[in-house]
Amino acid sequence: VVIYDKNDKILNTGNGFFVTEDGVALSDYSLFKGAERAVIINSEGKQMPVDAVLGANDMYDVIKFRVAITEKKVPALTVATVAPAVGAEAYLLPYSTQKDRTCTQGKVKKVTKIEDNYSYYTLDMRLKDKMVSCPVADANGQVFGLAQKASGQDTASICYAAGAAFAMSQGISALSLGDITLRNIGIKKGLPDTEEQALVYLYVASSQVSQEEYVSLLDDFVKQFPNSPDGYLRRASTFVFGGKEDADFDKAAADMERALKVAKKKDDVYYNISKQIYNYQLGKPEKTYKDWTYEKALDYVHSALAIDSLPVYVQLEGDILFAKQDYPAALACYGKVNRSNLASPATFFNAAKTMEMMDADPKEIVIMMDSCIARCPQPVAVADAPYVLERAQMNMNAEQYRAAMLDYDTYFNAVSGQVNDVFYYYREQAAIKARQYQRALDDIAKAIELNPKELTYRAEQAVVNLRVGRYEEALKALDEALAVDPKYAEAYRIMGICQIQMKKQEEACASFAKAKELGDTNVDELIKKHCK
């Protein structure tokens, strides 16, 4: 085995051996540590690349890997199913390009049980330097171990062998991406043996590896599980998501077709294809690929619904209809979902937003939103807080100002007070309309504290003070606004209104004139009314 580093320089050389005719081989883990790629050279001098690591154990220094074999099959050794007893003959098979290779003979001195009833051997046998990881066989020619060096004074008379059956038991699990032993090797890792574990592995990999590596894993999955629609659908999704040219979408379309062909549960595949085309259209492509329209997505979800009317399919139908701006039909779909076991805060929220698009009665929209929030765990947690914020705005639209203010309070508590100036401004708007003037003043002061350069807040502060007859405070707020921007026309208009209330007609008219000069169009009526 020849190991190369990141710079494609030889890092290590060592031994290994095939244990299956389709190219699975064993060697020592320490040989592969730091490898970026590896090749094997057989006894005939033929080179073949190592395709994937299939499992490793650093404690017992073993690795299992797959070679991309260049022939239909390769000569392989049979792994012994029964561990040899103490005193049994042991034969070490060296690597040799010569026909007259000689085995090193010895005996099993000690058998130690390791993980899950596997064995680790001490052998009465001297090991030469270049024999590490050569196979150790029993009298029947079956391999029971991988040769390992002894250390110190023992090297002259004994060596060790890690159990070949133990090395064969190494594998990739759904959580192997986080395994530091495997991460120390740059060569691609194989997939877990079962489809279920392999799918979890893909899910974890999708957020941890590069796009290129992920597509390579999907290719492996499709090869390993050719009758699973999941591999084709995930690969299609990757082509759609990263697609820039028709060639990418051609590949995606071909994978969608293959998924349909191999699927036993066709409705699930129709649903997946519909969702992919829907998401593709949501991304607003400059030029639509073939017939990948919302209409086509709708056709596919209808095909799924014809087989099984699952609520999740109805939900997608509603989403597509919403995107097509067919709001009454979308609302009908969301209504069905809300009467099913899929009903959730999100599904009621979808219905409420659809009603908004239909200009429904604001109070009816709030009732729908009440159903959304009633399904959230109470007290409302940070994850569901955005729903409360939405209902606050809906309550404002329905002129239910006190309810809106209470929603803002609930939101504030849900997010532990982690809010910005805009929040305080919105809650102030609810408070002033609910005639909670002191709360309005407190909130607008807080908004100004968080964002002192926002002139709207200072104008609002003046308006609230004006509303409660605090004219001096109103003028002070306006002076502060003009200190930030002397050309802020609205400040002069509000100043004029304030001065009218204070019976300062002349000053008021001067303020109105200044507002008009600075381009305020709302001041004309006031000039007509108060300034002859």
Regions found by a protein language model. Name each.
Residues 234, 272, 316, 350, ...:
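Canonical tetratricopeptide repeat
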